């Protein structure tokens, strides 16, 4: 990708073709145009949008920004720290981030959807987040094929994560991303986090709090996610609320939920009362591999705030949980909680797939379901349900 280029997207039937503006010529009567050697009839084109590419390159201690003549975008650079403010509300911006810097960062503020391509980026901040996207719209994060990308934030500061997105973060691309959290979370999104089928690998290797912390919901269709070294939970969702900080926001769909439809998750969590995967609401595993190793008093492999459904949609499902630990007693409330492989607050249904849960430690439990649970024919389940869990012969309500 060349820096600071303008492109045209030609939309037909929901699909689009992107061509450089320099490769577009128009017929004198306006009935057609030729883009990159292909002629289009104007009447057969659904719409046309324009894209401007901005390239940010870090080289040692200095960053440079190539933005050409793009309008409504202000940039400032101080050594390796880059701040970009956009008031653009009509053309989609695309940013290519590349190079290496041990004292650098990027903070982007805008109010329109945009894309960030990580093209071999190795960025460590000494002041705050490495990559902070302050835009509440849809943000596409593309891990360019064949690239390794590394982000780490400062050990101090008020940043929420090494990689923080205020909006809806959708990840794709077959490259890799390794994140080190030094202040709070490794990766944090205020709205949903979605990993598309084409996603490569994402690794969070440490964080003082959660490895991956997500508002609204977490949706995984592909990719490989590895989380370890965090002192909080491995992957956690939260329910977005209204201004009273109590009432769930009714406008946020799938609020607090986790969906695993494909890919591979491997989470290691260690510490008292910590969870490998924690869903604030319902959780659905319908494909892929989920492996969690949890150790510590009161630790949980998977903790679900409402219902848990395990089935198979378009891919095989394998869930393996290992939980080791005893009973945790809260110093303030004196409440006790036991180490548990899977803890479900409401109902649980296993209609397809393979589930293995192993638990060790005094008072530890395999699976604890506060509602009722169902195990369908043809499933492979190797786990012990606690005596308080009630089995049913029909699939229980999962709404």
Regions found by a protein language model. Give the residues of each.
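A composition-driven surface/loop motif
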Residues: 52-399
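Residue-level detector of beta-strand face positions
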Residues: 9, 32-34
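Boundary of Sec targeting at the N-terminus
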Residues: 4-5
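C-terminal trimerization/auto-chaperone modules of long, extracellular attachment fibers and adhesins
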Residues: 9-18
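Structured surface patches comprising rigid loops and adjacent beta-strands/short helices at the edges
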Residues: 20-30, 38-51
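Glycine-centered tight beta-turn/hairpin loop motif at sheet-sheet or coil-to-beta transitions
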Residues: 14, 35-37
């Amino acid at each position: 990708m060349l820096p600071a280029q303008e492109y045209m997207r030609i939309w037909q039937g929901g699909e689009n073709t992107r061509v450089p503006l320099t490769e577009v010529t128009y017929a004198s009567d306006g009935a057609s145009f030729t883009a990159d050697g292909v002629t289009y009839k104007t009447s057969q084109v659904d719409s046309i949008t324009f894209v401007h590419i901005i390239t940010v390159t870090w080289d040692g201690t200095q960053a440079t920004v190539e933005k050409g003549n793009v309008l409504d975008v202000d940039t400032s650079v101080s050594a390796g720290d880059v701040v970009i403010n956009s008031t653009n509300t009509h053309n989609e911006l695309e940013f290519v981030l590349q190079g290496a810097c041990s004292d650098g960062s990027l903070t982007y503020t805008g109010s329109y959807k945009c894309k960030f391509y990580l093209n071999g980026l190795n960025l460590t901040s000494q002041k705050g987040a490495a990559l902070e996207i302050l835009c509440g719209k849809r943000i596409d994060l593309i891990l360019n094929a064949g690239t390794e990308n590394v982000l780490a934030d400062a050990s101090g500061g008020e940043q929420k994560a090494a990689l923080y997105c205020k909006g809806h973060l959708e990840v794709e691309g077959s490259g890799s991303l390794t994140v080190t959290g030094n202040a709070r979370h490794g990766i944090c999104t205020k709205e949903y986090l979605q990993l598309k089928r084409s996603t490569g690998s994402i690794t969070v290797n440490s964080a003082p709090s959660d490895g991956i912390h997500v508002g609204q919901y977490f949706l995984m269709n592909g990719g490989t996610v590895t989380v370890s070294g965090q002192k909080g939970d491995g992957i956690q969702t939260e329910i977005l609320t209204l201004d009273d900080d109590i009432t769930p926001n009714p406008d946020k769909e799938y609020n607090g939920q986790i969906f695993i439809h494909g890919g591979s998750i491997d989470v290691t969590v260690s510490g008292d009362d910590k969870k490998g995967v924690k869903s604030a609401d319902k959780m659905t595993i319908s494909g892929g591999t989920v492996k969690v190793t949890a150790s510590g008093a009161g630790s949980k492999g998977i903790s679900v705030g409402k219902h848990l459904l395990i089935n198979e949609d378009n891919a095989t499902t394998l869930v393996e949980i290992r939980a080791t630990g005893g009973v945790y007693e809260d110093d303030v409330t004196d409440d006790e909680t036991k180490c548990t492989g899977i803890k479900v607050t409401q109902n649980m249904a296993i209609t397809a797939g393979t589930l293995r849960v192993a638990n060790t430690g005094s008072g530890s439990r395999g699976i604890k379901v506060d509602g009722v649970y169902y195990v369908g024919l043809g499933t492979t389940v190797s786990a012990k349900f606690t005596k308080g869990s009630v089995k049913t012969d029909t699939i229980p309500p999962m709404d």
